[in-house]
Amino acid sequence: MKEFYLTVEQIGDSIFERYIDSNGRERTREVEYKPSLFAHCPESQATKYFDIYGKPCTRKLFANMRDASQWIKRMEDIGLEALGMDDFKLAYLSDTYNYEIKYDHTKIRVANFDIEVTSPDGFPEPSQAKHPIDAITHYDSIDDRFYVFDLLNSPYGNVEEWSIEIAAKLQEQGGDEVPSEIIDKIIYMPFDNEKELLMEYLNFWQQKTPVILTGWNVESFDIPYVYNRIKNIFGESTAKRLSPHRKTRVKVIENMYGSREIITLFGISVLDYIDLYKKFSFTNQPSYSLDYISEFELNVGKLKYDGPISKLRESNHQRYISYNIIDVYRVLQIDAKRQFINLSLDMGYYAKIQIQSVFSPIKTWDAIIFNSLKEQNKVIPQGRSHPVQPYPGAFVKEPIPNRYKYVMSFDLTSLYPSIIRQVNISPETIAGTFKVAPLHDYINAIAERPSDVYSCSPNGMMYYKDRDGVVPTEITKVFNQRKEHKGYMLAAQRNGEIIKEALHNPNLSVDEPLDVDYRFDFSDEIKEKIKKLSAKSLNEMLFRAQRTEVAGMTAQINRKLLINSLYGALGNVWFRYYDLRNATAITTFGQMALQWIERKVNEYLNEVCGTEGEAFVLYGDTDSIYVSADKIIDKVGESKFRDTNHWVDFLDKFARERMEPAIDRGFREMCEYMNNKQHLMFMDREAIAGPPLGSKGIGGFWTGKKRYALNVWDMEGTRYAEPKLKIMGLETQKSSTPKAVQKALKECIRRMLQEGEESLQEYFKEFEKEFRQLNYISIASVSSANNIAKYDVGGFPGPKCPFHIRGILTYNRAIKGNIDAPQVVEGEKVYVLPLREGNPFGDKCIAWPSGTEITDLIKDDVLHWMDYTVLLEKTFIKPLEGFTSAAKLDYEKKASLFDMFDF
């Protein structure tokens, strides 16, 4: 195997690297790195180096990084550009690993850890770390073991040893239900005092130093607490042993929620799983507590316990340690499902960056472009700061609030990256500007063609067509790589299905799995051989196929995320290739493209349906259009369709054979009009939506921009046996809406779209009765605890105090002086409940930390004084009124004089 790096740090004038050698062993090296930088030189000077604009450059090799940094400063002082990679860690990685890195994740030591701290005076502040650490669970990926460090004797009480036998038992047998699959992997170590525990943990840490350090919220709590606690007891030099290079950095980050201390352990990449989840899950959750996310992802939360966590060690030490172990296990389970660690590794090694830099699209793309240009002897420009300036965003069409029975949507593939490639937008391809006409003149093709020579965007920018831009070239590479890896993924998936089929009737003759490449479809010969394999061999092959599928999926998702993140980087003033003109060219072209195709689709469908001036495109947003197909169905005649599948088949065929070619012709005309480098605006049919044939359902409705619901039967060619709801921007999708109300509103929408008004009215009556019987947490609304201090006037709400902040202040007064009650933390989510007049809390509402039960101290009073009427009106009826008003339906049956008679 070839070497690959694990971590790389610049400390002083040296590069410190942890890496895996060719024998698969972890090594460390200190390198006195000699970086290269570049300066422009005369045209007459012989050189093989050129900047991205084609200007000749001369290479300067420095004795060390300090000299290189000083040269950059001297160049800046005299107003000259110092070109090349000034992040010497990235430059070192590029020089050392000038090949595609094939990493082995089994060699990368990933630690997942969690600490417990008993604090008698509220939340244990990590920057102070004044209370003992009384439990640590540390999972090591290479050992596949859970190492548990348990403090038996503490200032807050002495406890008996934890029992693995009790932990494994069912709860009704007095056990903790620690899963059997991890029981044998637990190594339990009790300690009589904290000094012994911490020193043993530090020794263990140095023997098994993590490459990747993860856990839930470890960057904000566990890491700084462990570091500061060791520092408090043994001194700073001992705490620095947590870094394999004995180098740490303490940084205080200030934001609107207050301050927090971040400890950087040089030589270890921290991938806090809460941050990975927020970045890569693409979900908006009402709470990011581990308990809530575990329930959401795994359908099982943290280990439950009675009373406050501050009393758990003393009251039930057995449960306390099991709780600590399960916290670590839940993070492992979430990653086993989501694969965010592997995704980060794949992205990091592809870009050749420190693995923790995957959180930054700027750092990631800077490295990708640098490495690509370096292969061509092209020199990157110097990074410069730019003023923050606004520029246009995406186009969103204002819909007419209404019901829409039959709808088709069409979606542009990777709009912004495709615009960059089509127009050839890059810093070095700018050719000049042209006189700009109003945007609607370009949309309607009545403005003069901007240029016969250059590729244009309607913001007035012109780009060369005779050269490939750096940015479009890199996007194209990643596009092609994604296509390749997606092909591998799908082939492995198909091969897995063939193996599964053979497992239904395994043979006993051959007990040796075939040596095949799962990235490509099995040949007929291999398929025949598979039929002769034993179940053991087939299961081994299925495992390999599934592993290949996961590898392909991770690689293609990585490329997809990279593609989509580049536009964000290009619009960031800190990006090396930022140019406001280019950012504006991308978004303005996108605005034109969507409205251009709206015009073309309307023209085409008016022609098909024999109508004039009809607006068939009812909505558009950024890269998608939504087309009303009512008149298309009417032209054929709804009665002609046998069943729902029949009309879905018809619209599918109409979209594929008629509309997609018409759309493609329209975009080709636009490409010609703008004289672009190549045609890359590809728009495919996405959703086909409508009610079941013969039902009273309405099919779909819009209430406003980015707020709609559709009953979808087919999505991108995948036909559903049962329709799926596509809901965007409505209260069902908002984390502030109570969970039970989300579910009820979704059922209301389903009935509106599939069954009609009468069914909706029946359900409304049912839920109105059921509401008061629901668990209080499931009907509490959710808000963020922002700017508490701004509205806090001596513990009471100040002028213009928001409703949920008023509730937080009510809660704080109610629990004042009680350290066992969960504290509301600035910036975190809270549950909110309205209260009836005359309540003992003296205010309209109360709010407490989300993801938790309200403290027993005040629970009975809160439940007694809950205002169900206000809660139902605010969270359920008001949103429902918005849906039904737009859809021209009534959620309650209106009284009529005719109801008094039997006829």
Residue map of PLM features:
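DnaQ-like (DEDDh/DEDDy) 3′-5′ exonuclease domain used for proofreading
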Residues: 1-209, 323-326, 330-346, 359-396, ...
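Common nucleic-acid-contacting/processivity interface regions adjacent to the catalytic cores
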Residues: 308-428, 432-434, 503-512, 518-520, ...
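Conserved DEDDh/DEDDy metal-dependent 3′-5′ exonuclease domain
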Residues: 149, 155-285, 323
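Glycine- and acidic
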Residues: 182-188, 208-212, 313-319, 396-405, ...
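Acidic, Mg2+-coordinating catalytic module of metal-dependent nucleases/exonucleases
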Residues: 207-222, 226, 268-362
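Catalytic palm subdomain of template-directed nucleic-acid polymerases
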Residues: 625-659
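C-terminal, non-catalytic extensions of nucleic-acid polymerases
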Residues: 652, 656-903
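Intrinsically disordered, low-complexity acidic Ser/Thr-rich regulatory segments
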Residues: 175-191, 261-263, 451-469, 512-558, ...
